[in-house]
Structure formats: structure tokens, C-alpha cells
Amino acid sequence: MRIHYLEIVCSDADAQCAALEQVHGVSFGSPVADLGNARIAEASDGSLIGVRVPLAEHEQPIVRNYYEVDDIVKAVEEAEAAGGVIAFGPTRIGDTGNWAIYFFDGIQLGLWQR
């Protein structure tokens, strides 16, 4: 199981990026519209870290892991069969791939197919 994308939603994306750059030695780029204007950095293992502010008033700060999967539809079906509640079904994001979010035991988990 590999984390493809680590999403950090916070109130001050610039401050969060600066802290992550200082502590972890990564470098964040400009906001990416397809990813909710998240600023993206690539970790040493090739996984992506995205930092953005909430997209809606109801959205709260959160850190969400998106696990890489080969088949997003199958992974969503398996998550649901395991008792997960699908929050967002498979959704295409520009050229970045397909993602989905499900809840399990109060935790939000993401799936990502490149």
C-alpha cells in the first residue's frame, strides 16, 4: 500500500508550506487549480504532498491520505463492502488521475488511480 497523495487542508497554506519546507526539505510549487489550488511538493519517495485552504465554509482542517490503487472502481466497491461509507465516488481530476473518498470508523480515507 503506497500513499500517492497526502492532502493537508489548513487555514494558512503559505505558513504550512513554509514549515514543511523547513522541516522536511521539500519545495512547494504554485497552486494547482485541478487540485483545489493546492500547492504541491514531491517527497523523496515520489509521493505528492498538497497543501490548500478549505474550499467551502463547512470544510474543516484535515490531513487525508490517498492510497494508490490500480482500479478506482474496484477499490471503491471493496471499501464499501468492508463497511466504508463513500463520500465522493470515483472522480476525474484533470490530468492527475481519478480519486475517491470514503469514511471508515470516523476517518476519511482517499483512493487515487493515476
Where are the regions that the model predicts?
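N-terminal beta-strand motif that seeds the catalytic metal site of vicinal oxygen chelate
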Residues: 1-17, 63-65
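Vicinal oxygen chelate
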Residues: 1-4, 8, 29-30, 80-114
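Short alpha-helical
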Residues: 14-15, 73-74, 97
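Conserved active-site tyrosine of GNAT-family acetyltransferases
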Residues: 16-21, 79, 106
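Conserved short beta-strand elements that form part of the metal-binding/catalytic scaffold
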Residues: 26-61, 103-104, 108-114
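Short hydrophobic/aromatic beta-strand element in the GNAT-like acyltransferase core
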Residues: 40, 66, 98-101
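Mid-chain, well-packed structural core segment of small domains
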Residues: 61-88
